[in-house]
Design a protein with these regions (language model features):
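N-terminal secretory signal peptides that target proteins for export/translocation
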Residues: 1-7
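Sec/Tat signal peptide C-region and signal peptidase I cleavage site
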Residues: 24-30
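Bacterial N-terminal signal peptides
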Residues: 10-23
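Exported/periplasmic ABC-transporter solute-binding proteins
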Residues: 30-78, 85-88, 92-270
Length: 270
C-alpha cells in the first residue's frame, strides 16, 4: 500500500513538473493589430507604431491608401481593427453601416491644404480670389490632385478652388491621382508643375516646396477621425489607446499635424 502511494505521488510530481516546464517554455504570442489609414498619415503613424511595438512587443500592420478606398474595403469585409480617415465623411459612411465601434470614435488630428511645386521651381503665387493658377501651369502643365470626387484631399482641393473662383478654368488641367501621396509624387518627380496636397505631405517630401497655403475658410476644416472597427480584436484597444494619447502626440506634431482637443486626450496605459 505504501509503495503504491509513493508511486502515485511520484507520478503526480512528474506530471506537474512536465506541465510547468511546458508552460514555461511556450512563448507568449505577440498580438497583431491591423490598421487601415489615410495615405497622408504614413510618416507620422509609422513612427508612432514603431514606438508602440518597441514598448509592447506587439506587431502593428498598417495599410495606407485613400480613405475612400479603405472604407470600401472595410465594407467589403477586409480584416482590420482600426480605421484612421482623412475626413469625417468616410468615417460617417462606416458608422452608418454599423462597422465601427461608435464609442471609440475620436476626431484626433487637423491639417492644412497647400499648393506645391518642385523644389527647383521659381513659380510665385498669392492664393486669393481669382488668382492666376491656370496661367502658372503654362501651356500644357497639369495640376496634380487626389481624386476630386472621392479622396478627401481632392475634395478639399476642389472645394477650395471653387471658393476662390478658379475651378472652372483649371478643371480640365487636373491630373487626378489615387491618393494624396500619389499626387505628391507627381510634383516631386517633376511630372506636373503644381499640385495640391496637405501641409504634412509637403513637409515629408524634400523634393517639393510650398508655394502657398489655402485659406481655412476656402474648404471644410480638415479633420482626421480614428475609431476601432466593430470587429476589432480585443488586443487592438491597447494600440488605439496609445495612438490617441499624449504619448503618441509628438510623432504627429513632428510631421506638422495639429492635435485637436489635446487636453482631453487620455494618457496611454503603462
Amino acid at each position: 500500500m505504501a509503495t503504491r502511494l509513493i508511486r502515485r505521488s511520484f507520478l503526480q510530481l512528474v506530471f506537474l513538473t512536465i506541465l510547468a516546464v511546458s508552460s514555461f517554455g511556450t512563448p507568449v504570442r505577440a498580438a497583431e493589430v491591423t490598421v487601415f489609414a489615410a495615405a497622408s498619415l504614413k510618416n507620422a503613424l509609422d513612427d508612432a507604431a514603431k514606438a508602440y511595438e518597441a514598448k509592447s512587443g506587439d506587431k502593428v500592420v498598417i495599410s495606407y491608401a485613400a480613405s475612400s478606398a479603405l472604407a470600401k474595403q472595410i465594407e467589403g469585409g477586409a480584416p482590420a481593427d482600426i480605421f484612421f480617415s482623412a475626413d469625417l465623411d468616410w468615417m460617417d459612411y462606416l458608422q452608418q453601416k454599423n462597422l465601427i465601434d461608435v464609442g471609440s470614435r475620436k476626431t484626433l488630428l487637423g491639417n492644412t491644404l497647400v499648393l506645391i511645386a518642385p523644389k527647383g521651381s521659381t513659380v510665385s503665387l498669392t492664393i486669393e480670389k481669382g488668382f492666376p493658377l491656370v496661367q502658372a501651369l503654362g501651356s500644357d502643365g497639369k495640376l496634380a490632385m487626389a481624386d476630386v470626387n472621392a479622396v478627401p484631399a481632392g475634395k478639399y482641393g476642389k472645394a477650395a478652388l471653387i471658393y476662390l473662383g478658379v475651378w472652372d478654368a483649371v478643371a480640365s488641367r487636373v491630373a487626378q491621382a489615387e491618393n494624396v501621396r500619389a499626387a505628391l509624387a507627381f510634383v516631386a518627380r517633376g511630372e506636373t508643375p503644381l499640385g495640391i496636397v496637405y501641409g504634412t505631405d509637403a513637409k515629408a517630401e524634400p523634393a517639393v516646396r510650398v508655394v502657398g497655403t489655402f485659406p481655412e475658410d476656402s474648404h471644410l476644416k480638415i479633420e482626421y477621425p480614428v475609431a476601432l472597427l466593430a470587429s476589432a480584436k480585443p488586443e487592438a484597444r491597447k494600440f488605439f489607446d496609445f495612438v490617441v494619447s499624449p504619448t503618441a502626440a509628438p510623432a504627429f506634431e513632428a510631421q506638422g499635424f495639429t492635435i485637436l482637443s489635446k487636453s482631453s486626450l487620455p494618457q496611454a496605459a503603462e
